[in-house]
A protein has these predicted regions:
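N-terminal secretory signal peptides that target proteins for export/translocation
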Residues: 1-9
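Bacterial N-terminal signal peptides
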Residues: 13-23
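Sec/Tat signal peptide C-region and signal peptidase I cleavage site
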Residues: 25-29
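Primary mode marks residue(s) on the alpha4-beta5-alpha5 output face of response regulator receiver
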Residues: 30-197
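Low-complexity, intrinsically disordered regions enriched in charged/polar residues
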Residues: 8-9, 13-14, 44, 48
Length: 197
């Protein structure tokens, strides 16, 4: 699949899903969050272990068509941070975002970098949970995955989403700034011919 073949799903589909989830009963949302306690969150695993799990679980997505076939769709165009680098193109699996569960083998988002030849290169994964849901189910305990703490994105934000916790894992392209930082200094949106955020 090339960059031009990628269709950005309308942002309202993600926002609509968020609003539907917010209207769900608080009890069922809390139950979904608290019933999915993994040893992943309890263990203080070395960073390499999380990277290995992410690589093993996303290897098939080097072909973006397989990611699309499994429910991932492009949201937000290509996310650029100017001097700090970029986050690339986020292919979001909305049902995984809305289930409120964190599993290192099932990332909510897979991330691609647009290449000059028009192809997309898998560079990482992103785990995301909405802050209100997480904080309600786990008061005073920010999310972590295999010992890696998530970052909080407050609202309002550039994505138009409610506050959320996120953890980028640059498993397929080494990041000189760190494996789990939000921005990748070596990623660019220059080859993307759509909307750059």
């Amino acid at each position: 699949m090339t960059i031009r073949q990628c269709e950005t799903r309308p942002m309202f589909s993600l926002i609509g899903g968020v609003l539907l989830a917010a209207c769900a009963s608080g009890a069922s949302a809390q139950q979904a969050l608290s019933s999915h306690q993994h040893d992943w969150n309890q263990a203080k695993a070395p960073p390499a272990e999380l990277v290995t799990v992410v690589r093993e679980s996303t290897a098939r997505f080097r072909d973006v068509r397989l990611a699309v076939a499994e429910g991932y769709g492009l949201q937000f165009g290509c996310v650029s941070g100017g001097e700090v680098g970029a986050m690339g193109m986020h292919f979001v699996n909305l049902p995984l975002v809305l289930d409120g569960q964190l599993d290192p083998a099932r990332p909510e988002i897979v991330i691609y970098e647009p290449m000059p030849n028009g192809r997309l290169r898998l560079i990482g994964a992103d785990f995301l949970v909405f802050a209100a849901d997480w904080d309600k189910a786990h008061p005073g305990s920010p999310p972590q995955l295999m010992g890696q703490l998530f970052h909080l994105f407050e609202a309002p934000n550039r994505f138009g989403l409610p506050a959320f916790y996120t953890l980028h894992v640059w498993a397929w392209k080494e990041n000189p700034s760190g494996t789990f930082v939000n921005w990748h200094a070596g990623v660019s949106c220059d080859a993307f011919d759509g909307e750059v955020q």
